[in-house]
Amino acid sequence: MVYGFGRSDGTAAAAAGGAPERSWAGEEIAARLWRFYNEKTSTRAITRLQFVEHFGYLLFLKLDHERSQRPGRFARKPVVPEGTWPKLTDLSGDALHGRLADLMRDLGDQAPSRPDRRIAGMVFRDAQPWDLSRMAELAKLITEQIDPHQWTLVPQTELGRAFTIMLRDCREDIDRKIDTGQTLTPFPVLSAVVKVLGVRPDDIVIDPACGTGSTLIAAYQAMQSTDPAAIAGADLDAQMCRLATMNILLNTGRPFSDPAPVKLADTLTRKVPVVREDSGALPTVAICNPPFRSDGVVPNATMRDDFLAYGDFPTNFLQHLMVTLKPGARAAVFVPDGVLFGAGAAATVRRALLKNCDVHTLLRLPTGMFHRKGVKSNILFFTKSTPKPDNRSVTRNLWVYDARTGNHRTDTGNPVTEADFDDFVTACLAGGDISERTESDRFRRYPVDDLLAHPNATFDLKANLAADMEDLGSPKEIASEIADLLDTAATHFREVAEALP
């Protein structure tokens, strides 16, 4: 049985001028592909994330072929060798595996002589086909799900939505990538972030730990920009870079010959912000949800002479943006509670942040929002500035919005929605200026002098000071959080032990 798209009675095709692809919805595309995955593949041998990744590879090849076949001046020069897709549909077994391996190696080559392949170079970088024993399933994916349809006719927004939905459905696999600390950021949160940051069409937005690229997509959609250099990201996980590049391509509709929007890089080793190589323009906005912890990668920032102290991943990413952004740039950085009240490096960075930036807003996020992480999260909003000549702090007031107390969420049964942050956005943007903000039960102002008066300049603040036990989460989540804190403590003790003579 072939699982196609569109209505079997032809109604959708007739309504769309004989092309059913024009009426496809993102949810429908994702559902059909997951049905194929569950019924036509070995789900034990192929993870959901591997399935989505290979769907992305094959869709790239098919779209490139279709664009090259357009009539006259509408045709695009193919990035992939001409005739690749038709030949691929006739292969199976060893021949299919070998051809795909050769293609991935060729397209993933970062050859400077082929600037039109910069995006392909990232989509296929270090990519490998499924195991040889899985080629029958891959051949069916090609011949039953991808080849029969004209994917360039699918509305661009729906195609992008389908890929984003499928990535979201891979949350279990992504959360297992504990070696690089990956997680998925709910779109309603990102929607609120870009509104509060006031992202504009002329902005250049970066994410130095971009994961699947969702932050950049949210910014791009809010900007409605036509400039391909408007967004740029980096990640140290090659698989995430491949997925993020494809995710951005499908959500923005950019030509495959454009410069790559994402690069494979360890941002913390670089003393410069993420920029697009084709433009070199410095960013005006940064949005970052960095790894909160990692079991396989130690923060490598010890060679940074522009760092004041060396801490965990979120502390180092916060510091990286503080020192590399140009004056006037705006930022929103996700941080766990420990960065808000921890001593040592975290306290040093907090004091420097208050001194050199206008740290104007802290959003305490609902508990349970990030899948299986067991940590409480926050977002710090700040604007980079130049130091005051009299050594006073640039920050005058820190406004704290408490969206956490009494608001426990999960990413599946009770996910956050945009309505959860409507009041936050309204409170932040009231009057069009920070000076026009007013306090409420959930929104409170803290003068910077009060923050600095504390020995550690703690940001462990609440807008609603009433004790509320409902925001602690379930016993399982509390236990997970304790385990995370113990892991962090063990890491610090190991560092102390190694430093002792």
Regions found by a protein language model. Give the residues of each.
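Non-catalytic accessory regions of SAM-dependent methyltransferases
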Residues: 2-82, 500
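A conserved structural/catalytic subdomain of Rossmann-like adenosyl-cofactor enzymes
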Residues: 2-22, 269-270, 274-501
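Active-site-adjacent bridging/hinge elements
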Residues: 25-34, 163-168, 296
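Short, amphipathic alpha-helical segments that act as regulatory/interfacial helices
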Residues: 37, 55-65, 104, 108, ...
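Structural motif
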Residues: 41-53, 133, 151-158, 473
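S-adenosyl-L-methionine
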Residues: 50-53, 58-59, 64, 160-168, ...
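Long recognition/docking surfaces used for binding and targeting
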Residues: 66-174
